[in-house]
Design a protein with these regions (language model features):
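Generic detector of short, locally flexible boundary/turn motifs and exposed helical patches
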Residues: 42-45, 72-76, 107-110
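Catalytic cores and adjacent binding grooves of peptidoglycan-active enzymes
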Residues: 6-7, 11-13, 96-156
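Intrinsically disordered, low-complexity segments enriched in small/polar residues
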Residues: 3, 47, 91, 129-134
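Glycine-rich, flexible loop/turn motifs
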Residues: 31-34, 87, 96
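Extracytoplasmic cell-surface/polysaccharide-interacting catalytic and binding patches
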Residues: 1-71, 146-151, 155-156
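N-terminal start-of-chain detector that recognizes signal peptides
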Residues: 50-51, 77-83, 113-117
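A short linear-motif detector with a strong N-terminal bias
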Residues: 56-58, 85-89, 113-114, 119-123
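Extended, low-complexity, intrinsically disordered C-terminal regulatory tails
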Residues: 62-93
């Protein structure tokens, strides 16, 4: 390790991190039959029925949230799951948002975050599972959209 300043160190040979590296892949179901804590309605587009995006969330994505829910033992409230393009624009989402089911399934959710203890527990469990995490004041965004840059964390 090379010291770079007061209490800071860097590793010249950085390790390439990949999401899912610590997750047994056989745990991810391809349908909703093994999902304990969520149902598809929680991830439906919130555009008041103007679109037909009612069952477009990836079950493999939801399985990761289910594993987190089981691990932290706390309820997880979905603020936003799948979005149609129209609703995504209305809420100020990115043009190429993982919330929109571009390839048939969406791969993103915004999770209500009531306090810092929940934030800590959720992030600790989510880091090995998701390569894309956004942190807002009262929500956490997670997605596993393989078409977007990986191993990134941002703040809103």
């Amino acid at each position: 390790m090379k010291k770079t300043g007061k209490n800071h160190q860097t590793n010249r040979n950085r390790v390439r991190l990949t999401p899912d590296s610590a997750v047994p892949q056989e745990a991810a179901p391809s349908d909703w039959s093994q999902i304990k804590h969520f149902n598809p309605r929680e991830f439906t587009c919130k555009c008041d029925g103007l679109c037909d995006h009612t069952d477009c969330i990836s079950p493999e994505f939801v399985a990761k949230l289910d594993m987190i829910r089981e691990q932290i033992g706390l309820p997880i409230t979905i603020v936003s799951g799948t979005r149609c393009e129209r609703h995504n624009r209305k809420v100020g989402g990115k043009e190429r948002s993982a919330h929109v089911p571009w390839t048939g399934a969406s791969h993103a959710a915004d999770i209500r975050c009531a306090d810092s203890m929940f934030r800590f527990a959720f992030l600790t469990a989510a880091l090995p599972l998701f390569g894309r995490i956004g942190i807002g004041k009262d929500f956490i965004h997670v997605d596993d959209d393989a078409d977007l840059p990986q191993c990134v964390i941002w703040v809103y």
